[in-house]
């Protein structure tokens, strides 16, 4: 027994109890409860959380490094594609300028050729930037897949032991509530849980230290990687700009003394079909605006047509009125009142209108002569009555002087044209009508001659002759 270690049965029973199924189930229960509390975001013990503040800061830095390295890798890939596209477009522009320069034999053609060569050279030198970028991308991917992945595994194990440790703390807190040191009640159970807490804390502290060290090393290695790779890229970029600027400066020196040109850059190229569509759209809008400005649509009964019809009707009515006046005037001339006939101007009353009629043309003379014959037959002839009239009253009244104008001059006759047109007849009738309307009413005729004519039959019929003593009245009175 001297060469062997001896353990009491109490310790052996305790060791066997720790390995029992019940102990494992209790341990898993509290670990699961802690994981559930963390997943649901429930509030934990503030002292336990404060003890892991430095670890949480390191974890935050680790997640930042992981995220930024992923973004950097994507940006490098996109930057390489953009450089390739830019070099391709620059090369195409250089070729285009060279081809146009060969066709142009002026100084502008030489300038385009030189500029095209410079652009082609610049595009080739720009592709040299892809080498350090490709190397940079490979280093970043290696850093992500090696250093960050290893640190991530360590962090995951540390999180597992931290959950186990905090679960053991919850278990010990629950057992301590039933502990009674005076009665030694639950003492063995409390000691067993306390031992489990110490073991979990030991494992957790070890992994906590590993995580902090790896995160610090990861940050430093990332700084070294960026400084090394960016220095290579910076050197290549400086060489590229140096060569390009030297080439451009040489071309600029060769262009001195050339006549400057003013170039207009087209911002966008329009398709001919698009121009046609825009032109048609402008025409349509112009038509719509013109229709909007145009007057309202015509009414069912046009006022202008009605006005024209009324004016035509008035014209026809005026013509008919004048014609009726003309006919009426001829009739009235021949069949006037008896007072005018007895006024001493029977021939003038009948022959007056015919004397003022214009002489028609050769084609209408027959009609005019026929009308004159008709009118003359209807009037009083110079028969016995005319001769008797002249014997009694005399021939002075038939030879009246022509009417004088306002200034003592005779009334000028209207100039009769050689034609006998309807328009001239209408004008003549209008003038006669106006003259007849403007003439004042004639004074009452002297009826003495009339009473003298019938004095033989009735001497007392003339009241004006009563009391007169001249020879004529004495003869009548006798």
From Swiss-Prot:
It comes from the Eukaryota. It is a peripheral membrane protein. Disruption phenotype: 129/SvJ mice lacking Ica1 do not display an obvious phenotype and age normally, while NOD mice without Ica1 develop diabetes and display sudden mid-life lethality but are resistant to cyclophosphamide-induced disease acceleration. It is found in: Cytoplasm, Cytosol; Golgi apparatus membrane; Cytoplasmic vesicle, Secretory vesicle membrane; Cytoplasmic vesicle, Secretory vesicle, Synaptic vesicle membrane. Residues 306-317 have a biased composition (Basic and acidic residues). SMART domains: Arfaptin (SM01015), ICA69 (SM01237). Its main location: cytoplasm. Predominantly expressed in brain, pancreas and stomach mucosa. High expression also found in stomach muscle and testis. One of its GO terms (cellular component) is Golgi membrane. Transmembrane segments: none annotated. It holds the Pfam family Arfaptin. Residues 306-365, 398-422 are annotated as: Disordered. Residues 50-253 form the AH domain. One of its GO terms (biological process) is regulation of neurotransmitter secretion. Keywords: Cytoplasm, Cytoplasmic vesicle, Golgi apparatus, Membrane, Neurotransmitter transport, Synapse, Transport. GO terms for molecular function: membrane curvature sensor activity; protein domain specific binding. SUPFAM superfamilies: BAR/IMD domain-like. May play a role in neurotransmitter secretion. This is Islet cell autoantigen 1.
């Amino acid at each position: 027994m001297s060469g062997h270690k001896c353990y009491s049965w109490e310790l052996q029973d305790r060791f066997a109890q720790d390995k029992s199924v019940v102990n494992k189930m209790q341990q898993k229960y509290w670990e699961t409860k802690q994981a559930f509390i963390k997943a649901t975001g429930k509030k934990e013990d503030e002292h336990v959380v404060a003890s892991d503040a430095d670890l949480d800061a390191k974890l935050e830095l680790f997640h930042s490094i992981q995220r930024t390295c992923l973004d950097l890798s994507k940006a490098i890939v996109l930057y390489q594609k953009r450089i390739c596209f830019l070099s391709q477009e620059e090369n195409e522009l250089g070729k285009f300028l060279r081809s146009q320069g060969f066709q142009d034999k002026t100084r502008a053609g030489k300038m385009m050729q030189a500029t095209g060569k410079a652009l082609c050279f610049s595009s080739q030198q720009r592709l040299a930037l892809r080498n350090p970028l490709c190397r940079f991308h490979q280093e970043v991917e290696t850093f992500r897949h090696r250093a960050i992945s290893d640190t991530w595994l360590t962090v995951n194990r540390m999180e597992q032991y931290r959950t186990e440790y905090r679960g053991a703390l919850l278990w010990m807190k629950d057992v301590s509530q039933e502990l009674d040191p005076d009665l030694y009640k639950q003492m063995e159970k409390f000691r067993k849980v306390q031992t489990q807490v110490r073991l979990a804390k030991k494992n957790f502290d070890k992994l906590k230290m590993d995580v902090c060290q790896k995160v610090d090393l990861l940050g430093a290695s990332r700084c070294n990687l960026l400084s090394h790779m960016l220095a290579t890229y910076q050197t290549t970029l400086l060489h590229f700009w140096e060569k390009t600027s030297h080439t451009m400066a040489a071309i600029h020196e060769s262009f001195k003394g050339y006549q400057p040109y003013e170039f207009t850059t087209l911002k966008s190229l329009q398709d001919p079909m698009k121009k046609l569509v825009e032109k048609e759209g402008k025409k349509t809008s112009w038509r719509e605006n013109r229709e909007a400005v145009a007057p309202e649509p015509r009414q069912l009964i046009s006022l202008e047509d009605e006005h024209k019809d009324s004016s035509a009707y008035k014209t026809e009515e005026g013509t008919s009125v004048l014609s009726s006046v003309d006919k009426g005037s001829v009739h009235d001339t021949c069949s006037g009142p008896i007072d005018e006939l007895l006024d001493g101007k029977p021939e003038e009353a009948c022959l007056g209108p015919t004397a003022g009629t214009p002489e028609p043309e050769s084609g209408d003379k027959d009609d005019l002569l026929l009308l004159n014959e008709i009118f003359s037959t209807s009037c009083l002839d110079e028969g016995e009555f005319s001769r008797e009239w002249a014997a009694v009253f005399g021939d002075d009244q038939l030879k009246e002087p022509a009417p004088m104008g306002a200034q003592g001059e005779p009334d000028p006759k209207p100039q009769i044209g050689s034609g006998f047109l309807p328009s001239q007849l209408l004008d003549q009738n209008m003038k006669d009508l106006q003259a007849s309307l403007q003439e004042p009413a004639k004074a009452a005729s002297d009826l003495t001659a009339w009473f003298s004519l019938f004095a033989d039959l009735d001497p007392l019929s003339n009241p004006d002759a009563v009391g007169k003593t001249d020879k004529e009245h004495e003869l009548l009175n006798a």
